[in-house]
Structure formats: structure tokens, C-alpha cells
Amino acid sequence: MILKQGLKSTKENDEKVISKLKNMSDLTWAYIAGWIDGDGFISTLKTKHGHNARRIGIKLIDREIIEWFADLFHTSLTTATEDRREDGYNRKTQYITGVSGLRARYICEQIRPYLIEKTKDAEKFLRSFEDYPIKTVPYMQHTDKEFMAWFTGYSEAEGTFRISKTCKNKINSKGEHYKYMAPPEVKFELVNTNESIIRYCKTRLEKMGFFVQKVGVVKRNYSFMGKKGTKDRRVVKKKDLFRLFLAGSSAQPLYRSMLPFMRCERKISKVEKSLALVYRNKRRTKYGEKRTTVESSIVYMK
């Protein structure tokens, strides 16, 4: 269902939109590339009649992000066709916007230098235009600011911003059992099946001075996919997940660098609440590294 009508892709309309997009900064293009690498698509599929159906777009449950893209590119905002997950469960309502024609070619040209995961898709997309002279662009040569803009978009698409609250079972000096609610802890995770991207992000963040706790691996087994009781029901091997993790006071400097670029209200709210937690007591570990004590050091800013 169309919620907001955009400009039809004609040569005249595309040229008008492109003239406006030329005023956008490199950092905005890097941020957009992060979103496209995360939850976007760059498609060169053909129609059943053999015609090219080139499209660049994004599909999410966060309407404000899709609406921002739609307003920026003057495209239509629609709800995605209702479908079911492969495991048979219903999806949440998703919103989608896509761009085609000369407008899409220009957008692809602008985000291509900043893409990390979908570089081959972008090259294939541009090569599908017969008159397009493909140019070599530097790969993964972002400045620190460009990388942070890309990383912010990618993290809003693929990352998790949490404040963890843990209840622990403890015993006091009298031997009595009681429930102890530990102070909240900031936790950031970036999860993807592509190990090389996760490790690249870790290396780049550490070079910029951020402390990344670890990159973990979640081994995934076989599971059932498809609606129960149908012919589509099958057993598949899920890909392993790779997880970049920061917590506590280590996550907060990263949040401060990401916040100026962020546009997803749901995640902005979580980041602002996380930055309102103050870690103040320090201690030395047996390895000589300085860490923040979590359980006894969090106070709330008034």
C-alpha cells in the first residue's frame, strides 16, 4: 500500500532530484552506504519479459528511516507486501522505498566508494547501464569521519543498543538468600554472518582509539524452516554469527561519536539513556589494564 507518493522516474524528474542531491555531503553518502550495506538492496534482476528492473532501496520496520530515505530521494513510501517468515511466524509491518532509473545510477555512484559489503552488487548495477564507463574507485579507503558515518548507518541496521539489567541471587553474612538487582550496564553488539566485515570494524575502531572487548562466534546448528505441516518444511544449516561487543564505559565514547549521525529514533533514545549513565570508579586488573567497576560505580545524572 502506498503511504506517500513520490516522483515518477522520468529523465526530467531524475535530473531535478539529482541536482538537489549534488549538495549532499560525503558524510551523508557514507551514512547512506552503511544502511544499504546493512538492510538495503541493490538489484539488477530482470522482469519476466527480460527487461532490466534496476532498483536500489531499503526495507525496515522503522518507518521514520524509510520516510527519510523517501523524502531524500523523492520516492514513494509503501508498506511491504505482507508475508511470513520462513519459519512460519508472522512478520511485523515493514516499510519500503526504492529508486530506479538515472536517479538510482547517480545514487549508486555516490555510495559506491563507501560500500564495504555490497561493492560487487554496486559494480554489477552500474555495468548494467550500457553507456556507463565503469571507473575504479578506492576500496575501504574511508577517512575516520567517513568510516564513523558508515559504521553508524551499518550499526543502526545490524546492531543492538541495550541497557542490561541483571537480577542476581546472593547470600548475606547470615546465610540468607536474597535477590540483588545489579546496576544497569550499557551494551553494544554488532552481529553479522560476514566475519571479515566484523573483524574489519574491530580493527578500524581500535585504530581510532576505541576499546573493543572481543569478537565472538555463535555456532548455529540445523533448524526447521517453512510453515509447519507444508511441503516447504525443511531442515537447513544456519550460518554462524560473528559478534562485535562493547560494554560499559567502553561503549560510551563510541556512542558519542555515532550520535551526531544517527537518525533512527528508537535507537537514538537508547543511546541517549546509555550516555546518561556515569561510570566513575576505576580499578586495576591483574593484567594491569584500567577498567570501570560496573556494579558499584553507576550513578544517574540529574
Model region roles, listed by residue range:
Residues 1-302:
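Internal intein/HINT superfamily modules and their associated LAGLIDADG
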